[in-house]
């Protein structure tokens, strides 16, 4: 039976890969993103339904939810990324203790909005549409385990929130889990800041000696939404080739 799937941040990278995987199974897939042009191009190329929306803005999330229809089976909260890589200078450029605090506050709020609030808002907006047997899949990061940055903290908070969410929605027949990727090649996550030396270190840290691929994350999301994963909930699945282990 065809499912209805929503993938936030579906215009490129991992979101596009996840959307493509569900489409291959005959599902109806809605993709959202801030870049309306790129979203439309991706939708036309892969056969998805685009809804331009910034997942950090309540009014845009509410509008997006209204365009979905009444039913939903799978929610993949992919929207996010390390805003430290993409943001222009934020806050005042003045010197002094207050100016520094304002810059720190702006940087932290940006990553928390992009990586935590986006998932919370989207999930809240569509929760009543998710049918029994449905799945909520949030995408975290290995940075939640190692990065002493606002990005790592935001992804750690996402995992903690997901565990609590699982307890809340279990009685409705829903599951909620986190996929935590390690280094994934063929994406623009690092925005041109990944040096060859660091890339080599990231690959060397794995047990299987290779970078992750978008398909690794797409297949994991597809599995978590399958009938075979109905007793998996409240968990963080690490997809990193052994770069981080739970024991």
Label the predicted regions.
Residues 233-247:
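Short C-terminal tail/terminal secondary-structure segment
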Residues 89-91, 171, 184-206, 246-247:
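A glycine/serine/threonine-rich, flexible loop-to-helix segment
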Residues 128, 167-168, 230:
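Alpha-helical segment proximal to the catalytic Tyr-Lys
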Residues 92-120, 137, 158:
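Catalytic Tyr-X3-Lys loop
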Residues 123, 154:
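Active-site helix of classical SDR
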Residues 206-217:
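A conserved structural motif in NAD(P)-dependent oxidoreductases
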Residues 170, 175, 232-234:
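Short, small/polar-rich loop/turn modules that mediate ligand/substrate recognition or access, typified
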Residues 9-12:
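Conserved glycine-rich cofactor-binding loop
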């Amino acid at each position: 039976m065809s499912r209805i799937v929503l993938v936030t941040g579906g215009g490129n990278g991992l979101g596009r890969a996840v959307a493509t995987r569900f489409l291959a199974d005959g599902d109806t897939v809605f993709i959202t993103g801030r870049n309306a042009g790129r979203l439309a191009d991706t939708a036309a190329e892969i056969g998805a339904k685009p809804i331009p929306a910034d997942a950090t803005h309540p009014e845009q999330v509410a509008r997006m939810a209204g365009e979905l229809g009444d039913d939903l089976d799978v929610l993949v909260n992919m929207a996010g990324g390390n805003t430290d890589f993409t943001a222009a200078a934020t806050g005042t450029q003045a010197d002094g203790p207050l100016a520094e605090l304002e810059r720190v506050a702006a940087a932290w709020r940006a990553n928390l909005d992009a990586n935590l609030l986006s998932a919370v808002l989207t999930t809240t907006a569509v929760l009543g549409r998710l049918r029994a047997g449905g799945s909520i899949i949030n995408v975290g990061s290995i940075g939640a385990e190692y990065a002493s940055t606002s990005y790592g903290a935001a992804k750690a908070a996402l995992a903690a929130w997901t565990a609590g969410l699982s307890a809340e929605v279990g009685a409705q027949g829903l599951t909620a889990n986190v996929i935590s990727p390690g280094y994934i090649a063929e994406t623009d996550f690092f925005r041109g800041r990944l040096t060859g030396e660091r890339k080599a270190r990231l690959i060397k840290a794995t047990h299987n000696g290779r970078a992750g691929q978008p398909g690794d994350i797409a297949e994991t999301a597809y599995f978590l939404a399958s009938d075979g994963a109905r007793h998996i909930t409240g968990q963080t699945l690490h997809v990193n080739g052994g770069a981080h282990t739970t024991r």
